């Protein structure tokens, strides 16, 4: 049974061994999610960005329930059954970070995020590194003024670019986002490095994509797996994988 569980976790995209070094900065949120009524409260996960968190697949089709914001909600609720959790997307398809920064105070902060995710790099190629940097910094600073924990995401793939090219635009934006996460001490989901490693290992990234620049359900699950590091302790992660294994076996 143990070996079947490990095998199915691997097939589902859940890297069990990768969960040994858990991030510690979001301990307070994990504690909040464990509280029962009447001591609990609503926890808001806010996803700000472009078409990918919005759930766009093969445009104009939108598959909200397959996108990583919903996948994260499902997984978090599986492990924290007493938590009241909202997954809120303030993302807009086709938008870049400058546009997202302009509506940040009016449309994002009023949701009172407990965790804020920012995912804009795919579309920031159109405005360049310097303008993107200013926009990301503006959003980060405004959120940190309100003591909101932030998780920055590097981009998911665009098949029209060579992900193995270290000088590609998306690689440059990824490096900039990593520096921002370091400088502002935010969380980081390095989607780009993860997919790049898959390509280096010989995987065909087409299996993760709905179209050239939008992930499919399997591609979103790669992102979800990375995000869940911030929500699960190792024991909780193992419990979640076991539940997923049992669900598959019953089908």
Listing of model-derived features with the role each one plays in the protein:
Residues 14-18:
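Sec/Tat signal peptide C-region and signal peptidase I cleavage site
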Residues 4-12:
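Sec-dependent N-terminal signal peptides
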Residues 51-55, 92-98, 122-127, 156-160, ...:
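Solvent-exposed loop/turn segments at secondary-structure junctions
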Residues 119-123, 139-174:
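Active-site segments of SGNH/GDSL-like serine hydrolases
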Residues 60, 89-95, 117-125, 182:
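Cell-envelope and extracellular/periplasmic
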Residues 44-48, 53, 86-91, 115-120, ...:
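Structural recognition of the beta-strand scaffold that forms the well-ordered cores
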Residues 20-90, 104-112:
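Serine-esterase "nucleophile elbow" of acetyl-processing enzymes
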Residues 156-251:
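Catalytic His-Asp segment of secreted/periplasmic serine-dependent ester chemistry enzymes
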